[in-house]
Amino acid sequence: MLAYLRREWQSYGETVIAEGTFNSTSSDSSQSEKPIKTDGRYCYQAEIGRNAYSMDARGFMLGESDRHVDTTQFLPYTGYITDGIKYCNIEPPCGTLLRMHFDVSGDVSVDMHRVASIYVEVDSVTYDGSQYTIRGYRDRNLTATETQKKLIFYGFRKLGMIGMTGNGRVMLTSTIIQKISYKHQFTFQMHSESYVWGPCSGRIKTRVQGNDSRIIIYEQEDGFWKILKETLWIKLKPYFKPYGTMGGAFKNWLIDSGFEKHEYTYSYERDGQVVNATTVTYVKPTGKAGINQSWRPATDYNGQFTVLQPEDEFSVWYFEDKWQISQAIYAKNFQSDSQVEGELTNNGALIFKMNYIPSLAGITNKGGKVKYRYISGGFAQIDTSRHTGLAIILNFKCYGKKFYADNNNYPVDNALNPYICYIGDSYTLSGGTHYRQGACAGFAAGYDDEITEHDMTISYTVMKPSDPDFVTGGDNYGQTVTSDIERSIRDLQDQINSILAEMNIQQVTSAVFTAITNLGELPSLFSNITKVFNRAKDNIKKLRSRSNSDISPIGATKIIDKTTLETPQLSVINRMPEEYELGIIYNSMRTRKLIDERKHDFDTFAVATEMELPYISKVNTLTKEFKDYLKKPGLLSNDDVAVQIDPMNNRLSVLRRKYADIIEYKIDPELAHEVLSNMSNSATRSLFSLNVRKQIAMNNSFSEPTFSQIIDRMFDDGQLIDVLNNLNRETATELFDEFLTRIKSMLVKMS
């Protein structure tokens, strides 16, 4: 069992089989001692007196045929139809509604007449004393042929299907549904004895419909484990929450937008019980719409919002507290209603505004919409504020006409207009005959939150402890492990994008420079947040463990990492205290709103400290053998003063004594690892690279430094801080650009 708990369940119904656990065939049945259930607990026969026992556990593998079917439960048939096949094993409970898709391939006949595919929903088979009548509903306004009606009815006879011939095949897919959605009713009468059922009435109807929404098809108990197959109805509520960031000189440009990965909790009633459910909606939009003109003045609006357009996909994770997946350690054979579809429409006012008085802050816009349908589902491991463990994942795909106007020459299509969205101007040119460049069909991220709702029927098989006293995690042990961190990553990306936009026009906010002007106050800030910070860092490690990114060949280069080993500071004197480095990161990532409200965002801060920093070492601290090693390929000369390894881009930089030039070389990861290993006895990990150090050292308003003085200052953090405090805003902005680039590189690896 431990092997199963160590492995993470994989999405889309895939599983991982652990060798030596449930698949093991080496147990000796003669030595086994079977547990006996007494008063709800499991005991072993004491009189046997064995000191050790083993249990012959049966492997539970994907693709095995089901066993121990309980014939007292109604089970609609799904599979290929041949003579003798029955569509149900017993009479369905009253109120049962079935959706039946008959897909015919090849030449198939019933009673010597060829039959075609048909999709229907059936709500009853009744008997009036002389004949049986089936009532159904077709998905289209076409009269069903007599042969199609026979195909539907014959399987409900107690004798089963008779009279099917031909070299083709008929595939039947049956699902239990909650309400009839097909509109075109038909009936058919026969005299053969058949299974009958119809609508329920009064209190009985309510009770039976509740039972029909949840059916245990079979339940097998073997020792500690119980295997169940369940079919149930769920209410799915995807939640679409847009976000965006206004930037630029005057906060009039939309620089980023999209949909959050949003967790939504709600309740509904099923079987007379209140079901507490949670969905996590992950939207993957690819479209953009709106005006995009980089030459526009900063006082005007510019920018495109993100659009969920046809062919885009979104996924919805779902879990609840009343299904059999709770406490399950294994799941397989997921099936779901394949007919769910819907439409997302932009509603409400635009959430973005320009930085003017309210009467002038509005932005011309138009919302759009997009249709979507269910495509597939499976199982996934989820980690939210309410639950840690198994969930189902349902995938949806948008469909319709995909459209984007990449110029002003597309004529207006009135049928397409309701789907078009735009921001920054009218979506058509003057005259209304052509779409404006940037018009796109789809659901835009820029309006009110949107919640859709779907009733779905799902089926699955799970393995769980048969003793209710055993627990495997789930709601009782669920914690917010990574969802807040993932949100912090997006928040940090928003802040980086906003700061970069401001830097492009030399209008950096004062929050960036709090780190420079108030360095002396920083150590006290971090004295009381150790526990909070450690929690966030541990959560980031869990998030990294689920990432598909390659492992960096260079380790221990982050500003804070429990594996970082501090080395003797032989290369840099008066080294900047770590609290100062943390302060520069912390205050740089702190928004004006947080400063005004005297609040802190430690999760975002913890994410920022994951960036990889350069290692710097003076050449005179390196061994002779290693210097010769670098000189062979021409990476080091006799005039070099220092070397630097930057794990962000696997670059080796050397500082020349003459003119204080910095030469960069792109090297492979193996060589980077070798260089760092040989530098480990003398290197200094630093927030400031050689380039930043040189730029700071050269900015001295009192005298023009010599190259020798520049080099000396570059390796004296005390002098660097003194100069840094007196830099003007423009110069500090240039230095800060590398710092932001380093964080952006880290975010790409974590996303």
From Swiss-Prot:
This protein's name: Outer capsid protein VP4
Site (Probable cleavage): 207-208, 214-215
Keywords carried by this UniProt record: Capsid protein, Hemagglutinin, Host cell membrane, Host endoplasmic reticulum, Host membrane, Host-virus interaction, Membrane, Outer capsid protein, Viral attachment to host cell, Viral penetration into host cytoplasm, Viral penetration via permeabilization of host membrane, Virion, Virus entry into host cell
GO cellular component: host cell endoplasmic reticulum-Golgi intermediate compartment; host cell plasma membrane; host cell rough endoplasmic reticulum; membrane; viral outer capsid
GO biological process, one term: permeabilization of host organelle membrane involved in viral entry into host cell
InterPro entries in the record: Rota_A_VP4, Rota_VP4_MID_sf
Source superkingdom: Viruses
Family label: Belongs to the rotavirus VP4 family.
